From Swiss-Prot:
Region listing for Disordered, in residue ranges: 1-63, 176-237
Keywords, in A-Z order: Coiled coil, Cytoplasm, Nucleus
Disulfide pairings: none
Protein name: NFATC2-interacting protein
Length: 434
């Protein structure tokens, strides 16, 4: 059976793209299968989305229309392809059939199917190229600021104006020159480096220099100027100096205050009492304690002893050890201490001097070996001591058979001796040996 005329004319004539007609079999000398005739494509199940293409590749109409290319495609994954080869007339123009569907994975050929009728022709559709960004591993995508205009509109940085900084430095130099004499040094404020304002447009006008704005932007506000207080302080120092001079002048011109001050000084100096020393004076076996100032002469000590011994002060002799003391000396000049003892001796009256009171009596103490044998006897100065001996023997119960001896300063006494002869005075002690 011969081939049809429409197939014979297209077996050896390639199309404009260099591809063969649908009836031509490019695989070899084998004869192409006889087409059964124009048969309609089966109705597809519905529009199915095209799977993601591997790349933009153009569809080939000749290969898509070839019947031998469409054979054996019934076992496709989508299940929408016909089981027999489709015949498409080369004289009819292709129309839109429906969504583009991949014939097989990895194949660049597509066709569209219409849902309205199964008689619609298969049409080649060029897929739309999708712009995709491919990032290699290890690369970081460039960040794009979405709200750049918002940030620039809200961000207000101080302008890069050197005039404002010059004005601030001049202001500080002027204030520093005014306060050179003051001792208080104002704290140094740290100035921030000038920053630039970031804007999209190049025609933005720079803001005028604003000193107050720079001050408010600092972390700690600078202290208020204290120039008036310092001026007042200098005036106050002048006033204090004048007051001091007036006080000095008043002190010079007011003698009353000076006299009062001197009197107060005298009172303070004389208020402390003079130191005193207790001087020990020994007369016979008796010890006298007399208070004497350190600057008083020993004459006062002699007068005190004369009053206690009922004798004249001229008859008092003071001895320190074996040395006779001058009555004009003082305890301070002699460096006397509490441990020193001064001996007192009563001198006999000079010859030819009559006693003023011959009947004067004195008290003499008589002491035996026992402590209980103690007796005080009143005798006259010119009276013999025999009466004293008799009173003592009678008081102690001693008879004439007992041998009794009386001694005064190691000297044995006799009955005819008198107190005046022996220099006896009141409170002198006579020892008794029985």
């Amino acid at each position: 059976m011969g081939s049809p005329t429409w197939l014979q004319g297209e077996k050896s004539s390639p199309n404009a793209r260099g591809q063969h007609s649908p009836g031509f079999c490019p695989s070899g000398p084998q004869p192409c299968p006889k087409p059964r005739g124009p048969q309609p494509c089966p109705k597809p199940r519905g529009p199915q989305p095209c799977p993601k293409p591997r790349g933009p590749q153009p569809c080939t109409p000749a290969l898509l229309w070839a019947p031998h290319r469409l054979e054996g495609l019934s076992q496709s994954q989508d299940g929408l392809l016909p089981t027999s080869p489709c015949f498409v007339s080369g004289t009819e123009a292709p129309t839109a059939c429906g969504p583009c569907i991949d014939i097989e994975s990895g194949s660049p050929h597509r066709y569209e199917a219409s849902e309205e009728s199964s008689d619609s022709d298969v049409e080649l559709v060029r897929p739309r190229q999708v712009k995709r960004r491919r990032l290699l591993p290890g690369t970081v995508p460039a960040s794009v600021s979405v709200y750049s205009n918002k940030v620039n509109s809200s961000l207000k940085l101080p302008p890069d104006n050197s005039k404002a900084l010059l004005q601030m430095s001049e202001l500080h130099s002027i204030r520093g020159s005014e306060d050179v004499e003051s001792e208080i040094v104002p704290p140094v404020t740290q100035q921030k480096p000038p920053t630039k304002e970031l804007t999209d447009s190049e025609t933005d006008e720079t803001e005028p220099p604003n000193t107050e704005r720079l001050r408010t932007g600092s972390p700690s506000p600078p202290p208020t100027p204290k120039t008036p207080v310092r001026r007042k302080g200098r005036a106050y120092n002048k006033i204090r100096e004048m007051d001091a001079r007036l006080r000095d002048l008043g002190t010079v011109l007011s003698p009353g205050q000076k006299v009062t001050t001197e009197e107060n000084d005298v009172i303070v100096v004389g208020s402390s009492p003079a130191p005193e020393l207790t001087v020990k004076v020994r007369r016979g076996g008796k010890l006298f304690r007399i208070n004497l100032a350190m600057w008083d002469p020993l004459e006062k000590l002699a007068q005190s002893m004369a009053s206690q011994l009922n004798v004249e002060p001229s008859r008092i002799l003071l001895l320190l050890g074996d040395e006779e003391l001058n009555k004009s000396q003082t305890p301070k000049s002699m460096n006397l201490t509490v441990a020193d003892i001064i001996d007192c001796v009563v001198l006999s009256p000079p010859d030819g001097q009559e006693d003023s009171d011959p009947n004067e009596k004195i008290c003499i103490k008589v002491q035996g070996k026992e402590k209980q044998s103690h007796l005080s006897v009143m005798v006259g100065k010119v009276e013999p001591l025999q009466s004293l001996m008799d009173q003592y023997q009678a008081a102690m119960g001693l008879t004439k058979k007992h041998k009794v001896s009386f001694f005064f300063e190691g000297q044995k006494l006799k009955g005819k001796n008198t107190a005046e002869e022996l220099g006896l005075e009141s409170d002198d002690i006579i020892e008794v040996w029985a």
